[in-house]
């Protein structure tokens, strides 16, 4: 089954799992040194916390992609003042140049030390470790269960290149039934200049936060009364979603796909057959009984497409079959991991499934790559990071089919000319896959598209086709999502554009600004012309002065503001102000209509008046 996961995004206000965040693996000596710095800094922080708060119990403290954190069980909540005191304590430890030394001990020795320090969480961690047990000491008075790596001494840490950033809630072992902890996040770098750049990038990310932009531009909301993780699309956001969906459908029809619509629920027996109840039950909403049958909301669209394939006898002459669906799915997400549109409980996946012959794999994958590039580049995502994940040790399926499928993926990527990295053994147990990350305007990489071969569902559902020799054969099944989650993609796209959407996609393309009541009838007539031409336009009827009309339009990031005074009305024209190009001067209405229609048909970023 394809699991086109949404991306987890940490939030300082959220309650998160007490488990390590993804890390940047050391690929160069420079990166490895940075990880050593961050890992060591987490120990320094834990030591400082326990010096200031002797009753604080420690749990885990890994490095992360941009820094480090440590989870504590402390009787009182940490405050901003506490963070300042902890930072001062850390600086003192750094200045002492205390050594960090690796020590191997037996299980019994480790248990004795842990019990002496009254560290129950470390005792639980110890249960899962094999001998020899490794500790790292920090000076003579503090130590931690740890495998490393670390710097040699705290003098190698730069006291001017770290910051404690926030406090969040976290559950021990990620289990909401267990103790709630306090997680202190920090960031650490080699130089003060790197720290300053990190802060600048973080401020820029906050400026681009899709949650703030979504509220400011009135695009969407999540209403507590309805429940967490359920998105309400407001009229302006709904317009944009419709534009995205229409483009997606057009691209798929042109790519040889047919569209499906499938139910939102299914009898529980379907989820047993598909394996979801065995492998995915924790992410599914519970069953509901209707007419003495149990149903569950779908967490994925795949089994429905499989049933559609199985609804009639298939011939090899029909293959490949390409089906796509904008299907809304429902998954249970813990409260702590939900984050705006990035991770929600009800979302729409742009799922597609291709049923093909083994010899068609490479061609079909190449077509998917071409379609992926066409769609993503339309939203100005042009830089990708691609990983090919191969067969893991535990897997199902015939060796020859695995080899053929993997070679097909490689061949398609090479025919496309895209660079890629191989993740040996990183594929799902049911097939190899390609994952594609996109880079946004400030250099962040986002997991987006997935292409996954599946040898599992065709076997579970006994799918077949009549081959040329009259025998029944299993089809190759390719799962594919380009956006992944439409909601999540909308959030990524919004942050990429910082809310300054290209003209073709803007919810309100042109705002008419009549400066006097006398030109109001002309403005109404122009609004009708624009609307009839397919241009999304409005009139500001507030009666405010021109300066405020313009400021309001700019705050709402309207791409084109059309000022209408007596002169413009007499000339059947408008004075245009473009967010992209500045003052465009007086423009005839006919030219505005033509340029706006061209922008829509060509999916252009702005008006081209020449």
UniProtKB/Swiss-Prot annotation:
It catalyses: tRNA(Thr) + L-threonine + ATP = L-threonyl-tRNA(Thr) + AMP + diphosphate + H(+). Its cofactor is Zn(2+). SUPFAM superfamilies: Class II aaRS ABD-related, Class II aaRS and biotin synthetases, ThrRS/AlaRS common domain. Disulfide bonds: none annotated. Its main location: cytoplasm. Residues 8-24 have a biased composition (Low complexity). GO terms for molecular function: ATP binding; metal ion binding; threonine-tRNA ligase activity; tRNA binding. Residues 209-502 are annotated as: Catalytic. Zn(2+) binds at residues 302, 353, 479. Its EC number is 6.1.1.3. Keywords: Aminoacyl-tRNA synthetase, ATP-binding, Cytoplasm, Ligase, Metal-binding, Nucleotide-binding, Protein biosynthesis, RNA-binding, tRNA-binding, Zinc. The keyword Aminoacyl-tRNA synthetase applies. It is found in: Cytoplasm. Binds 1 zinc ion per subunit. Residues 1-29 are annotated as: Disordered. SMART domains: tRNA_SAD. GO terms for biological process: threonyl-tRNA aminoacylation. GO terms for cellular component: cytoplasm. Catalyzes the attachment of threonine to tRNA(Thr) in a two-step reaction: L-threonine is first activated by ATP to form Thr-AMP and then transferred to the acceptor end of tRNA(Thr). Also edits incorrectly charged L-seryl-tRNA(Thr). Homodimer. Belongs to the class-II aminoacyl-tRNA synthetase family. This is Threonine--tRNA ligase. It comes from Synechococcus sp. (strain WH7803). The lineage of its organism: Bacteria, Bacillati, Cyanobacteriota, Cyanophyceae, Synechococcales.
């Amino acid at each position: 089954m394809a699991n086109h996961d949404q991306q987890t995004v940490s939030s300082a206000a959220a309650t998160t799992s007490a488990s390590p965040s993804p890390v940047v693996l050391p690929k160069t000596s420079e990166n490895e040194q940075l990880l050593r710095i961050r890992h060591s800094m987490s120990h320094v922080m834990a030591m400082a916390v326990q010096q200031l708060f002797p009753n604080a119990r420690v749990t885990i403290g890994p490095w992360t992609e941009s820094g480090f954190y440590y989870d504590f069980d402390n009787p009182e909540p940490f405050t901003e003042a506490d963070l300042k005191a902890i930072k001062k304590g850390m600086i003192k430890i750094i200045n002492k140049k205390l050594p960090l030394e690796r020590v191997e001990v037996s299980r019994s020795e480790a248990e004795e030390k842990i019990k002496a320090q009254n560290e129950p969480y470390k005792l639980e961690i110890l249960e899962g470790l094999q001998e020899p047990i490794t500790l790292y000491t920090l000076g003579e008075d503090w130590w931690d269960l740890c495998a490393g790596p670390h710097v040699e001494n705290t003098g190698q840490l730069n006291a001017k290149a770290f910051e404690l950033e926030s406090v969040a809630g976290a559950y021990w072992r990620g289990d909401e039934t267990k103790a709630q902890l306090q997680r202190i996040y920090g960031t650490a770098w080699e130089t003060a200049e790197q720290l300053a750049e990190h802060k600048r990038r973080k401020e820029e990310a906050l400026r681009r936060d899709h949650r703030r932009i979504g509220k400011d531009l009135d695009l969407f909301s999540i209403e507590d009364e309805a429940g967490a993780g359920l998105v309400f699309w407001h009229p302006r956001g709904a317009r944009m979603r419709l534009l995205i969906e229409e483009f997606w459908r057009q691209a798929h029809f042109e790519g040889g796909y047919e569209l499906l619509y499938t139910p939102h629920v299914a009898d529980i027996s379907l989820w047993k057959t598909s394996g979801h109840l065995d492998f995915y039950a924790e992410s599914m909403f519970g069953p509901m009984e209707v007419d003495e049958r149990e149903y569950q909301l779908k967490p994925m669209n795949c089994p429905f497409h499989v049933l559609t394939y199985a609804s009639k006898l298939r011939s090899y002459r029909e293959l490949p079959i390409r089906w796509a669906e904008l299907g809304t799915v429902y998954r249970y997400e813990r409260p702590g991991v939900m984050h705006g549109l990035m991770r929600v409980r009800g979302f729409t996946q742009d799922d597609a499934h291709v049923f093909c012959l083994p010899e068609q794999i490479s061609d079909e994958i190449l077509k998917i790559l071409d379609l992926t590039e066409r769609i993503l580049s339309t939203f100005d995502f042009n830089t990708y990071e691609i990983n090919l994940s191969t067969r893991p040790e535990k897997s199902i399926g015939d060796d020859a089919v695995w080899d053929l499928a993997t070679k097909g993926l490689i061949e398609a990527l090479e025919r496309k000319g895209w660079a890629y990295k191989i993740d040996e053994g990183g594929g799902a147990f049911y097939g190899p896959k390609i994952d594609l990350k996109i880079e946004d305007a400030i250099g962040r990489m986002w997991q987006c598209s997935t292409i996954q071969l599946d040898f599992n569902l065709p076997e579970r559902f006994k799918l077949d086709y009549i081959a040329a020799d009259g025998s029944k054969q299993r089809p190759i099944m390719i799962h594919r999502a380009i956006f992944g989650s439409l909601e999540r993609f909308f959030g990524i796209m919004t942050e990429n554009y910082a809310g300054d959407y290209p003209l073709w996609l803007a919810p309100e393309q042109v705002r008419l600004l009549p400066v006097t009541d006398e030109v109001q009838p002309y403005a109404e007539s122009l609004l009708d012309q624009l609307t009839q031409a397919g241009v999304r336009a409005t009139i500001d009827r507030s009666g405010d002065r021109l300066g405020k009309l313009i400021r309001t339009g700019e705050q709402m990031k309207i791409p084109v503001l059309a000022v209408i005074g007596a002169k413009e009305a007499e000339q059947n024209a408008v004075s245009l102000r473009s967010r992209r190009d500045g003052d465009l001067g007086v423009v005839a209405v006919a030219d505005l209509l033509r340029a706006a229609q061209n922008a829509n048909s060509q999916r252009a970023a702005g008006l081209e008046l020449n």
